[in-house]
């Protein structure tokens, strides 16, 4: 399926959920708090912006909007700049050491250069994680395992008849110009969004730039 590729030994790959959990634990250790299942229904700008949820409100000196594809219609100006796109992943049953080495020598992580890219790597227990299928409807296909299995075996025919143990989907935010977006709606309301499926590294870079701006330390 592929005519060639670039092997970059300077890059690495990681377990994104473990990264998220580790960062949440670091935030808690610094005295921060995370409130899940707290849908924001309105943001009122001002000298002290007010963020309203379905159960109450929060007044803050600074607000950062980082909901990406999950912002909905909360801020129409931002919603018009990002298209939620469903990206799906399947995980095979654990592969034999020989088969795992055959399909991905060196335990590398791979992605292709398309905007709606495919990506794949091995898990610690030698499952192949194969992701992609970005579509612009934001909807998960009814036969997710079947659709992703077909894509996987086009790349790895060696995996014909391999069981698929897990399948899931989530939204990624595709920017209208295919570039990440950051900026301000006012002096104290910032936003960062639209990573087009490449968010693990850029989210951290853009968060740092935004934090420096808020702290008055930005020289970029």
Language-model-detected regions and their locations in the chain:
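Conserved Rossmann-fold dehydrogenase catalytic segment
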Residues: 1-2
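Glycine- and acidic
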Residues: 5-9, 131-135, 190-193
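Active-site nucleophile and cofactor-binding loops and adjacent substrate-binding regions
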Residues: 8-9, 167-169, 193-199
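Secondary-structure transition/capping motifs at alpha-helix termini
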Residues: 28-33, 153-161, 217
């Amino acid at each position: 399926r592929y005519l060639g590729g670039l092997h970059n030994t300077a890059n690495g790959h990681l377990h994104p959920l473990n990264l998220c959990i580790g960062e949440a634990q670091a935030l808690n250790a610094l005295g921060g708090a995370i409130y899940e299942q707290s849908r924001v229904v309105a943001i009122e700008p001002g000298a002290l912006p007010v963020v309203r949820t379905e159960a109450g409100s929060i007044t803050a000196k600074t607000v950062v909007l980082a909901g990406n594809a999950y912002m909905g219609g909360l801020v129409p100006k931002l919603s018009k700049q990002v298209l939620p796109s469903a990206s799906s992943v399947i995980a095979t049953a654990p592969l034999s050491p020989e088969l795992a080495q055959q399909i991905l020598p060196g335990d590398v992580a791979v992605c292709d250069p398309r905007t709606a890219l495919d990506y794949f790597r091995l898990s610690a227990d030698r499952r192949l994680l194969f992701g992609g299928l970005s579509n612009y409807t934001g909807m998960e296909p009814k036969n997710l395992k079947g659709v992703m299995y077909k894509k996987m075996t086009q790349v790895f025919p060696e995996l014909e008849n391999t069981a698929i143990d897990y399948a899931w989907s989530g939204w990624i935010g595709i920017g209208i110009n295919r570039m990440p977006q950051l900026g301000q709606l006012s002096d104290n309301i910032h936003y960062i969004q639209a990573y087009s499926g490449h968010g693990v590294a850029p989210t951290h870079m853009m968060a740092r730039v935004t934090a420096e701006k808020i702290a008055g330390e930005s020289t970029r």
